[in-house]
């Protein structure tokens, strides 16, 4: 819950301006793909945003920094409820990408369950293997999307930019290139179609040959 009391969470989730501020910073793709955060990022690669709202019982508006994944998880599933020990569940990312905000990739769990779930989702070939660290990886993906949009890129071109940014921090010796066998070894659930992944992999090969991956 990030130290935010339930009453304030209710106000934040009900406030149209708060919802709009969160949603405007999410780049959405297909139903099963990662939806990436385009705003500020924590050192762990999670999205964050400052919101201002007044709770029903509060005399003055509150200004709080909110975890984007916690906000969107609760928006889609309802308020997090405390565990038997009084602690609140964590929001984990089944895809292994902390900046992903696709609600179907988010799940409630404990710290141990979060780590196990990330490994089970295949993040050891993605975020966990990235030499840039979680924040560096998330920033690279965010900046690739923002730059592609600013350049007027098509959704397909943006998908190529995302894949290239995602694999650029993974040492080539640890990465199996995804053609001709498809995209099964690309990070998490953030795989594009085979053609897009092959284009991204081709870009990685070119960069590796030029010594620009490290």
List the predicted regions and their residue ranges:
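Short, cationic Gly/His-enriched loop motifs
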Residues: 62-189
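Short helix-coil boundary/hinge micro-motifs
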Residues: 1-66, 86, 95-98, 159-163, ...
């Amino acid at each position: 819950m990030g130290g935010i009391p339930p009453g304030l969470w209710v106000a934040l989730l009900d406030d149209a301006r708060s919802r709009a501020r969160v949603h405007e910073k999410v780049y959405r793709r297909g139903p099963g793909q990662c939806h990436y955060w385009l705003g500020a990022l924590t050192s762990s690669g999670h999205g964050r945003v400052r919101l201002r709202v007044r709770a029903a019982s509060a005399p003055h508006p509150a200004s709080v920094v909110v975890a984007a994944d916690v906000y969107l998880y609760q928006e889609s599933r309802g308020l997090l409820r405390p565990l038997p020990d009084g602690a609140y569940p964590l929001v984990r990312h089944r895809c292994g990408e902390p900046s992903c905000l696709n609600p179907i990739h988010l799940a409630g769990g404990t710290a141990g369950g979060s780590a196990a779930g990330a490994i089970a989702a295949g993040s050891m070939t993605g975020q966990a293997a990235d030499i840039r660290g979680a924040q560096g990886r998330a920033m690279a993906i965010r900046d690739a999307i923002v730059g592609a949009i600013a350049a007027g890129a098509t959704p397909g071109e943006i998908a190529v930019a995302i894949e290239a940014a995602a694999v650029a921090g993974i040492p080539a010796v640890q990465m199996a290139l995804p053609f001709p066998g498809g995209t099964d070894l690309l990070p998490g659930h953030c795989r594009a179609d085979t053609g897009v992944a092959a284009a991204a992999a081709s870009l990685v090969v070119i960069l590796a040959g030029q010594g620009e991956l490290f």
